[in-house]
């Protein structure tokens, strides 16, 4: 808040992003809410990238905005502290990275489509869930959401323009335009509180289900795998959420979904991590 008040420019890097990334620190350091706090600061541009090319595009854009265009903004970027492969940047995704969302991987199939969205460390869980679902004949595509905050701000700006023009101008939010190019229910999973990704619910294309997974509750000291299982943001819970939404819309039978329970180790009697 002090940086915003002083009109600072620069990059603030949160190097222990997410509730499950810095495992073993428990209540002391696990962060599931900093992006929500960042959203309260008007001149703070925040991102939760996963891959090195996303970070590069964001930093390049920040340098241009702050030091070439002289915009009075500063950046809050969360980074991770675990080792994983970093792919080459797909073609044509720069604008999506800057604005907050792009399709990382489109399913080759078309049967039972579902859209999986993720950010930060949990994007890799989302990618693993998509692979499992594809093996089950589910056309699961993956979206990288670099900034739910920026998507929300864009959506609110579009709503404001429509309001003040009495409907004469009705710009479409960027996230709406992107997701309209897909079909099926949408599942979002992040390493932050559910409220972070739930911000864009008003801008989900009409008639589409939107299921949000997040890390509400106090941090714990454990392995990353155990923490993600505890907060229900591991790949198994992402896959289960996709199956549940497909069942609700009638494209997956209840019996077929129930057959997944043992395979994914989904416990219906598990205590809610928000209170446990």
What is the predicted function of each stretch?
Residues 36:
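Extended active-site and interfacial segments that coordinate phosphate-rich ligands
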Residues 10, 16, 20-31, 39, ...:
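Thiamine diphosphate
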Residues 1-4:
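Long, structured ligand/cofactor-binding scaffold of large enzymes
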């Amino acid at each position: 808040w002090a940086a915003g008040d002083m009109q600072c420019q620069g990059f603030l890097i949160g190097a222990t992003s997410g509730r499950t990334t810095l495992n073993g620190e428990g209540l002391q350091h696990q962060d599931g809410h900093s992006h929500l706090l960042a959203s309260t600061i008007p001149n703070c541009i925040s991102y939760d990238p996963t891959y090195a090319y996303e970070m590069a595009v964001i930093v390049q854009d920040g340098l241009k905005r702050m030091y070439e265009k002289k915009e009075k903004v500063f950046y809050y970027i969360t980074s991770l502290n675990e080792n994983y492969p970093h792919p080459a940047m797909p073609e044509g995704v720069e604008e999506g990275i800057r604005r907050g969302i792009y399709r990382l991987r489109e399913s080759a199939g078309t049967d039972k489509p579902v859209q999986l969205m993720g950010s930060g460390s949990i994007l890799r869980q989302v990618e693993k869930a998509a692979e499992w679902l594809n093996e089950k004949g589910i056309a699961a595509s993956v979206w990288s959401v670099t900034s739910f905050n920026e998507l929300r701000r864009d959506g609110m700006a579009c709503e404001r323009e429509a309001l003040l023009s009495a409907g004469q101008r009705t710009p479409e939010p960027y996230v709406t335009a992107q997701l309209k190019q897909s079909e099926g229910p949408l599942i979002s999973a992040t390493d932050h509180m559910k409220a972070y990704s739930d911000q864009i619910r008003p801008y989900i294309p009409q008639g589409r289900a939107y299921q949000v997974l997040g890390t509400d509750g106090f941090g714990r000291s454990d392995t990353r795998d155990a923490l993600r299982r505890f907060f229900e943001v591991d790949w198994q819970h992402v896959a289960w959420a996709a199956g549940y939404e497909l069942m609700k819309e009638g494209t997956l039978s209840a019996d077929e979904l129930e057959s997944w329970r043992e395979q994914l180790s989904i416990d219906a009697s598990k205590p809610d991590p928000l209170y446990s």
